[in-house]
Amino acid sequence: MQVIIAEKPSVAREIAAIVGATNRKDGFIEGNGYAVTWAFGHLVGLAMPQQYGIAGFRRENLPILPSSFILLPRQVREGKEYKADPGVVKQLGILRELFGMAERIIVATDAGREGELIFRYIYSYLECRTPFVRLWISSLTDRAIREGLQHLRPGNEYDNLYLSAKARSEADWIVGINASQALAVAAGRGVWSLGRVQTPTLAIICSRYLENKAFKPATYFRLKLSTAKEGTEFTVLSTEKFDGREKAEAARAEVIGARTVRVVNVERKEAREQPPLLYDLTTLQKEANSRYGFSAEKTLDIAQSLYEKKFITYPRTGSRYISEDVAEEIPALIGNMTRYPRFAEYAGRMDTASLSRRSVDNEKIADHHALLPTENLPSELDADHRIVYEMVAGRMLETFSGACVKENTFLTLQSAGHDFTARGSIMVETGWRAVLNEPVEEKEEDMTLLPDIVQGDELPVKGCGTEQKQTRPRPLHTESSLLAAMETAGRELSDEAEREAMKDAGIGTPATRAAIIETLFAREYVRREKKSLVPTDKRLAVYAVVRDKKIADVAMTGGWELALSKIATGEMDAPTFHRGIEVFTSQIAKELLEARIDGAESDTACPRCGRPVVFYPKLAKCQNPDCGLTVWRTVGRKELTDKQLAELLTKGKTGTIRGFVKNGGGTFDAALTLDDQFKTSFVFEPRDTPRQGKRNKRK
C-alpha cells in the first residue's frame, strides 16, 4: 500500500479521486492500493521552555539555547495551561498506523518551505523510517496531479528545503522566546511579544508613523499661468517655488505686465511602457490592497481558495517569471480566455505567435513559477473571488501583450524672467493597457492637453494666479507599502529590477508576510485607519524600548532571510546559520536585559496574585515573574488615569468613564471591568425603565 499525505482534507479528497481511492475511513480515504490522508496545518511544532525544565521569566535563565529541540503535537490553551489538541493527537495516531503499514509515502503537502516542514516534523515526531517521495506540482487541476504522480521526485531532493524550513522555525523560537522574556524581565515582568520578523516589521510601521507626526509642513507658492494657441487653452506652472506670498505676488505682477509668454524649448519623446511582469503573491497583495482595500491576509485566503478550486496556480510563489516549458502553454491559456466574458474580446485579438517574453526566464524561478490562471474557467464566483481571479487572468494577458506607446511633450516657457513648465502626453498604441482599459493615474499638475507648439512661439498671458502649497510628509504605511518595504528590507526601490534583486533579502517570505501583519493586529500593536496602518500606544511603548536594538534591525533580518534562502539552495549549511542565530540571540538578550523602562511601584495589589503592581506610562504590570498580569492604559483610544487603573485593579470595575472612541468615529461612555481572564471589557449602564417600557409596549 502507498500512503499519500496532503496538507488538508480538501486537497486529499481531490487526490483520492484521481488515484481511485473512494472508501472513506476515519482520517483517510483508501482504495486501489492507496490510503490518502492529511494533516490540517502544522500538527507538530517546537515545545515551549517548560518542556526543557525552564519555568517563568528569570534573568538567570537567559539566553535559552536548547542543544536539540523537542517536538510536540500542536498545543491548545486550557486556563493557564497548554495541552495537546485532542484532534491532533488522534490524527497523529492515524498517521502513525498508516505510515507503519506503507511501502512508501507520497508527500503531497504544499510544494514550498512550510509544506515541507509540516510533513518532516510529523515524520520526525513519529520516528518514521518508511521511504518517501515528493509530489511537487504548481496547480491542483486533474491534469497537474496526474502528471505529478507520474513524475514523483526522490524525497531527499528536498532535504535542503527542509533544513531551511527547520532553521527558520528554530530561529523564530530562539529569538522570540529570548527577546520576549528579556524585555519582560527588564520591564518588571508582564507579557511582551517580540520576534525575529515581527519586531522589525513593527519598527517599519512605527518609524514611519513617528516621522509623519513629527513632520513640520512648509508653505510655498507657485505661479499658475493660463495661455492659449489656436483656440486651445492650457496652463503652465512656474518652476520656482516662492517661500512667501509677497514674492509670489511680485512675480505674478511682472508676468501680467509682460503680457506674453515665450516657448523656449519643446522636447518630444516616444515612451514605451513595457508590460508588467506576472504576479507573485506579494505583488498581488500590494495591488489588491491599493486598488480594492483588501488586506494581505484576505488576498492570500482568496488566492488559496481559487487554487484549491483549480482556477489558478500555486499562490505562495515568490517568482514573477515562468519557465520555457510553461511559456509553451500560454497561447492555449490565452485562447481559453476567449470564453471568459470580461476578456473574450481582447484575448481574441491577441497574436499568440508574437507574445512578449518579458516574464520568461528559467533562471528566475525557484520553487514555483508566477501566478497564472489554469485551463479551468470559473462559472460562478462571488465578487471578491472574481476580483482576484480577474487580477491574475488579466495580468497574464497584459504581460504577454505589446508595449504601451506614448508621445510625451515637455515644454519650457518664459515670461518676465520667470520659467514655466508643462507636460502633455498622447497615446500612440494602447498595447497592454487595453486589457483592463483603466485610466492611467497621473499627477494633475504634471499632465495637460497641449496644442501643437513649436519653439519660439509667443503666446498671450490670459491670466496668472498664485497657488499656495505645502510640503507633505511621507504618508503612513498601508498594507501595500508595508509589503513593499518588507520585500526589500525597508529600502525604498522603485526600479523593478532592483526590487527583484532584493527579494531573497526581504523580511519574511511571500507565504508568511500576511500572517506577520495579522499578528500585529491580533496583538493590538497596530490598527487600521481607512487604509493606513497606525501603531497603538501599546505598539509605541514597545518600539520606544527596542528601536535602537538589534531585535528591530530591519537590514539584519533581511540578511537572515537571505541566509535561509541559501540553505535551501545548498549554498550555506544550517549549523553555520544556527550558530549565528545563537550569537545574535545572546546579544539581543543582553541588550534588552539592560534596557531601562520607567515605572513607579504603586500601593495597588495584583488581583490575580496579590503582589505589587508597577504603573508605567503606557501600562500597569504585576511584579510577580510568574504572574504576567498586564493592563494597558489606553482603552478605546482613551488613556486611563492612575486612579482609574487602581480602581479597576482593586475593585474589578470602574465608574462610568466618558469619551471612549468608536472604531468608526464618535464617542461613547462606559464603565470598565476585568473578566475572569483579567481582560478589560466595557460595561454599559442600562437604559432607564420608562424607555424600556415603551420599547416593550411597541413589541
Where would I find each of the regions flagged by the language model?
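Metal- or metallocofactor-binding catalytic centers and their adjacent structured scaffolds
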Residues: 243-279, 285
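C-terminal helical "lid" subdomain and adjoining coupling/linker elements of P-loop NTPases
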Residues: 186-193, 205-248, 291, 315, ...
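Basic, low-complexity terminal or inter-domain segments flanking catalytic cores
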Residues: 2, 81, 88, 125, ...
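Conserved short loop/turn motifs at secondary-structure junctions
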Residues: 1, 109-111, 188-193, 268-277, ...
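C-terminal or mid-to-C-terminal helical accessory/interaction module adjacent to the motor/catalytic core
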Residues: 87, 100-101, 142-225, 268-272
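Amphipathic alpha-helical transducer elements in NTP-driven molecular machines
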Residues: 9-16, 33-36, 40, 59-62, ...
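Intrinsically disordered, low-complexity regulatory segments
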Residues: 1-169, 173-175, 473
